[in-house]
């Protein structure tokens, strides 16, 4: 009998061609960046397990950077949506929390809040995530602290139905883009950090410099979203640089 988890965390490793891979072996508090993300996710109290899903080109690097107790799923597949569907066959679960591997400040408390909100929804939902004040999914923003929740059966349905290339690359895009087919729940992103002048993802050296400045100021163990918001609120010069980067890379 196959054991089925209630909720599985899946960290999607950035592709080998991404800017993040250039920085992936850099270290924070002695840990490679990808290990750092993995350990923040495993701090969640409501995930039954965590795996990393990587494309074939990135798998060798991922296996050297991901802690040995966290499986890396890198089976060959035509696209990432197909790879996720295959991963869910190997790791059966009722629901998934999807985390981007470049979300350095992914917040385990926000992951747990998301799971609770999805499970306690008045009507059963297929997808839940944080929504930004601009009406877009907050996971698409450069704030970089959010995750998204979905039922495994919704992912399998998307895998069968999605034809557009972008829907095959961005594994949840088909689901949240079709509210007529799936029950969607949006949770308001925290106003304190849902801002145009906040950027906590990493795509270049400027982002890396900001990350180091933040960790130097707050320490590696005090990086919850509230602490980040309070710190950035008193850093107008840093926020101006972040806003400029967000505008330039939009």
Where are these regions (language model features)?
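Conserved core of the sugar-phosphate nucleotidyltransferase
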Residues: 106-198, 209, 213, 230, ...
């Amino acid at each position: 009998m196959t054991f089925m988890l209630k909720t599985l965390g899946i960290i999607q490793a950035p592709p080998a061609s991404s800017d993040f891979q250039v920085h992936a072996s850099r270290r924070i508090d002695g840990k490679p960046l990808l290990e750092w993300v993995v350990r923040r996710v495993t701090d969640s109290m409501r995930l039954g397990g965590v795996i990393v899903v990587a494309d074939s080109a990135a798998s060798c690097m991922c296996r050297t950077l991901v802690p040995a107790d966290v499986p890396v799923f890198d089976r060959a597949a035509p696209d990432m949506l197909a790879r996720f569907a295959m991963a869910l066959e190997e790791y059966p679960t009722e629901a998934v929390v999807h985390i981007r591997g470049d979300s350095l400040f992914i917040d385990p408390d926000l992951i747990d809040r998301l799971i609770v909100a999805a499970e306690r929804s008045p009507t059963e939902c297929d997808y839940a995530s944080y929504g930004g004040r601009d009406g877009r999914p907050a996971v698409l923003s450069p704030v970089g602290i959010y995750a998204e929740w979905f039922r495994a059966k919704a992912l399998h349905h998307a895998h069968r139905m999605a034809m557009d290339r972008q829907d095959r690359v961005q594994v949840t895009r088909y689901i949240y883009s079709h509210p007529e087919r799936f029950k969607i729940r949006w949770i308001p992103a925290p106003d304190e950090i849902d801002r145009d002048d906040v950027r906590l993802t990493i795509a270049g050296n400027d982002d890396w410099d900001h990350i180091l400045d933040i960790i130097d100021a707050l320490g590696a163990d005090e990086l919850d979203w509230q602490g980040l918001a309070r710190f950035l609120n008193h850093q107008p010069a840093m926020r101006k640089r972040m806003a400029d980067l967000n505008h330039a890379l939009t």
